[in-house]
Design a protein with these regions (language model features):
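The serine-hydrolase catalytic nucleophile loop
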Residues: 34-47, 61, 238
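Short beta-strand/loop motif that positions the catalytic acidic residue
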Residues: 220, 226-228, 232
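Catalytic nucleophile-loop/oxyanion-hole region of alpha/beta-hydrolase
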Residues: 7, 38-41, 64-102
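N-terminal cap/lid segment of alpha/beta-hydrolase-fold proteins
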Residues: 1-26, 76
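Primarily recognizes the serine-hydrolase "nucleophile elbow" in alpha/beta-hydrolase
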Residues: 85-163, 197-200, 208, 219
Length: 249
């Protein structure tokens, strides 16, 4: 296995894993989840895929890990554009078959792959794992109508302050993704991986609320596999099923 790291356009840092031998190979681009960096979780998947004969590409979104950009700034459309940038780079590499580039995404990245396939074009296939379809439904499904109204009103007021003054509140990742599973994951990894120990805008919650990958899923034409987990408490299986139904429509 040949492993190499590159800094490409837009300041995106990526790592390729390639099987030995000189022939062109199909490629899988692995797209991480919420505030994820390429050193965590993805290498295990990438190594298995590479052992099966694929070139694999892991990367850091702008603002995270080793990539350039404002630290902690998470905007879904910008991350989708990052994936498209990686797709275009992959298709230019002499060791990659440009007609066989696929996307594999987990959690938030599992939603991004639909947008990247639509915006980038030429994607051979998609695997979306443990993603959500509709951010507003996913975040507010447990709230009463009054609680939801108050929650959204608070975010809108904070957004108005930001636009008027340029000031915004930055918080730890676990203040935004605050379920027990996520807290445990970030607490376990931030010591070993200092790039995980960052602050993000509190209004990232609003970015997630407004994000609806299902709208892109309805436009996807390439073969797609949607993977859900029965006991997923972050992105319940109903969210993945909604993505599936949208793709099949």
């Amino acid at each position: 296995m040949i492993i190499s790291t590159h800094k490409i356009s837009e300041g995106i840092t990526l790592t390729t894993r390639s099987p030995s031998g000189g022939k062109k190979r199909p490629a899988i681009i692995l797209c991480h989840g919420f505030c994820g960096i390429r050193e965590i979780l993805l290498p295990q998947f990438a190594e298995v895929f590479t052992q099966a004969g694929f070139v694999t590409i892991t990367f850091d979104y702008r603002g995270f890990g080793d990539s350039d950009g404002e630290r902690g700034r998470l905007i879904p459309e910008m991350q989708i554009d990052d994936i498209v940038t990686v797709i275009n780079w992959a298709k230019e590499q002499p060791f990659i078959d440009k007609e066989r580039v696929g996307l594999w995404g987990t959690s938030l990245g599992g939603g991004h792959v639909f947008g990247a396939a639509v915006k980038g074009g030429g994607v051979k296939c998609i695997v979306s794992q443990l993603a959500f379809a509709d951010g507003e439904k996913n975040i507010t499904h447990h709230m009463s109508s009054e609680e939801k109204k108050e929650f959204i009103s608070t975010l809108e007021k904070l957004d108005a302050v930001k636009k008027a003054s340029g000031r915004e509140k930055f918080v730890s990742i676990t203040r935004v993704l605050n379920d027990n599973e996520s807290k445990k994951f970030f607490e376990e990894n931030r010591t070993q991986y200092p790039d995980m120990d960052i602050k993000i805008p509190f209004l990232t919650v609003k970015e997630m609320l407004d994000y609806k990958p299902v709208q892109y899923a309805a436009q996807v034409t390439c073969p797609s596999l949607i993977v859900v987990a029965e006991k997923d408490t972050v992105n319940p299986k109903e969210q993945g099923i909604e993505l599936y139904n949208s793709v099949m429509h």
